[in-house]
Amino acid sequence: MSASDGNTAELWVPTGSVTVRVPGKVNLYLAVGDRREDGYHELTTVFHAVSLVDEVTVRNADVLSLELVGEGADQLPTDERNLAWQAAELMAEHVGRAPDVSIMIDKSIPVAGGMAGGSADAAAVLVAMNSLWELNVPRRDLRMLAARLGSDVPFALHGGTALGTGRGEELATVLSRNTFHWVLAFADSGLLTSAVYNELDRLREVGDPPRLGEPGPVLAALAAGDPDQLAPLLGNEMQAAAVSLDPALARALRAGVEAGALAGIVSGSGPTCAFLCTSASSAIDVGAQLSGAGVCRTVRVATGPVPGARVVSAPTEV
């Protein structure tokens, strides 16, 4: 905040803001282990960051506050239930300070859409506070804090394409030689990740939903930069559960392929569907046809891979 007479030096409080841009993710490959005794599932996944981004602006303030605008903003809490708020508290605790910042999130990543938007926002807050407060917290410490917040948060820091294991938080960079073109179809309503996991457990108890092979061929297709090679290898063991809970997803997946996409997949726990296309022009055509097909709420065209959470405006005096 600035003094009413404009003389900020008299405040003895640093002022300014930092804006961080952070991408959503698509899981190109997602294998889910059986439920463990602690309730978690071991994952093997290939994360892919795409150019659908949230912008998170953090300013110094008297107290911690959170405001959201944009895609699905009215569906999210603006208090300690929000992962971005928790990230601010965790970073402040890590450096022994009070979390006195205001956070503004301009959302484009769908809420409860299987693209890790909440995790992305949390990662962005860590990066923004590190820059705003000039903390120079090392990258390895940021990764540790990210993992404490949730299993998708480390990848939002990492970006690009990565192989995730454990609960998804243990990452290894994957070579991706090309820009891949995507159409993202947002569903009318969200799916809770916990509900999709529970449905997957139920389906496995009563039957044998599809299991994926090893991710090696997916990694080879990414290294080759070939969308035609990658398309038939896209796989998500949570897809059957997501479709079971929201049968309209099957129609959306079918419509995308009929519109000319190489392949379609439910992203993560859904319900966002991601369609791989041969080119930028093909993605525009597929997106236009999907928009008019009545199978989804909104369509976005995106590319990947893109970088993880990064500062787009450094600390500035206000």
Swiss-Prot record:
Cite a single GO BP annotation.
isopentenyl diphosphate biosynthetic process, methylerythritol 4-phosphate pathway
According to UniProt, this protein's pathway is: Isoprenoid biosynthesis; isopentenyl diphosphate biosynthesis via DXP pathway; isopentenyl diphosphate from 1-deoxy-D-xylulose 5-phosphate: step 3/6
Q: What class of enzyme is it?
A: transferase
Active site positions? 25, 152
Q: Which domain of life is it from?
A: Bacteria
Single GO molecular function: ATP binding
Q: Which UniProt keywords apply?
A: ATP-binding, Isoprene biosynthesis, Kinase, Nucleotide-binding, Transferase
EC number(s) from the headed UniProt entry: 2.7.1.148
Q: Which residues form the propeptide?
A: 2
Catalytic activity, as annotated:
4-CDP-2-C-methyl-D-erythritol + ATP = 4-CDP-2-C-methyl-D-erythritol 2-phosphate + ADP + H(+)
Give binding positions for ATP: 110-120
Record keywords: Kinase included?
yes
Is Transferase a UniProt keyword of this protein?
A: yes
Which Pfam families does this entry report, sorted A to Z? GHMP_kinases_C, GHMP_kinases_N
| Family label | Belongs to the GHMP kinase family. IspE subfamily.
Please, what other remarks does the record include?
A: Was identified as a high-confidence drug target.
| PANTHER family linked to this entry | 4-DIPHOSPHOCYTIDYL-2-C-METHYL-D-ERYTHRITOL KINASE, CHLOROPLASTIC
Q: Which NCBIfam families match?
A: ispE, PRK03188.1
Write out the function statement from the record: Catalyzes the phosphorylation of the position 2 hydroxy group of 4-diphosphocytidyl-2C-methyl-D-erythritol.
Protein name (database record): 4-diphosphocytidyl-2-C-methyl-D-erythritol kinase
Could you tell me the gene encoding this protein?
ispE
